[in-house]
Amino acid sequence: MSDAEQSNEPIATPRGQAALLGPVEVRALAEEFGVRPTKQLGQNFVHDANTVRRIVTTAGVTRDDVVLEVGPGLGSLTMALMDVVDRVIAVEIDPNLAARLPKTVAERAPELADRLTVVEADAMRVLPSQIPGEPTALVANLPYNVAVPVLLHLFASLPSLRTALVMVQAEVADRLAADPGSKIYGVPSVKANFFGEVRRAGAVGRNVFWPVPKVESGLVRIDRYAEPPWPMDEKHRKQVFAAIDAAFAQRRKTLRAALSGWAGSPAEAERRLLAAGIEPQTRGEMLDAAAFVRLAGGE
């Protein structure tokens, strides 16, 4: 650990640049403040500066964006974001990490410290009223055990979010970006596509994390529809999502059978399917988000 780190003095950096965290700094911070990554919170800290810079570049955020970061951890990605944008709102569930992050930023990027706001909250339950301002972009290394519900909750709760670039487990990334008809297409695929266009945006190696995870990681990008093709209000979204859940709850059954409970009977399910222009013998994995919207009666 350097003298500057030991004395908690600000580290001298070029104006507008943060001293990003490397493996030594990540482990030192964790040890100094008793932070131990927990499986329960899905914590794996990125310690590679090139990786976090690549994430920021891939996200395509600019100075005017208000970036929401979920699970900032020790601040690796946070400080890379602060190099580029004027405002970062970091939502952290771990009180120790939430308390430490502003201090780390003040030490390693003192001239950028006023760009950061930390919100101690559970991202799966955080309310718009808890988040200052209107975030335009979500850029995050999401906790892998709750990545999909967090992503969907934030897009549903924060209509100001125009785009997201998130790092998740590679298998989850593939499912989110899957096309109708593929074996991995399912509930996450359709629900994410309800909000916008979804695509894979790259892979991330295991060796950039501490501790090293047992799974591969990938980047996913979601761009919210500039002109929503269907209503996005909560009532309509819940109706559509209920149809999606029912269709995939019994994945191998035809939609006529799978949707019988949702519709009230097989006959009513068939009537609704035909009214939406969907063949009743089709399976849910063949339908895109637009088809589920028609089925729920909201297009």
UniProtKB/Swiss-Prot annotation:
Keywords: Cytoplasm, Methyltransferase, RNA-binding, rRNA processing, S-adenosyl-L-methionine, Transferase. S-adenosyl-L-methionine binds at residues 44, 46, 71, 92, 122, 141. Gene3D superfamilies: Ribosomal RNA adenine dimethylase-like, domain 2, Vaccinia Virus protein VP39. One of its GO terms (molecular function) is 16S rRNA (adenine(1518)-N(6)/adenine(1519)-N(6))-dimethyltransferase activity. It catalyses: adenosine(1518)/adenosine(1519) in 16S rRNA + 4 S-adenosyl-L-methionine = N(6)-dimethyladenosine(1518)/N(6)-dimethyladenosine(1519) in 16S rRNA + 4 S-adenosyl-L-homocysteine + 4 H(+). Its main location: cytoplasm. The keyword rRNA processing applies. It is found in: Cytoplasm. It is an enzyme of class 2 (transferase). Specifically dimethylates two adjacent adenosines (A1518 and A1519) in the loop of a conserved hairpin near the 3'-end of 16S rRNA in the 30S particle. May play a critical role in biogenesis of 30S subunits. Belongs to the class I-like SAM-binding methyltransferase superfamily. rRNA adenine N(6)-methyltransferase family. RsmA subfamily. This is Ribosomal RNA small subunit methyltransferase A. It comes from Rhodococcus erythropolis (strain PR4 / NBRC 100887).
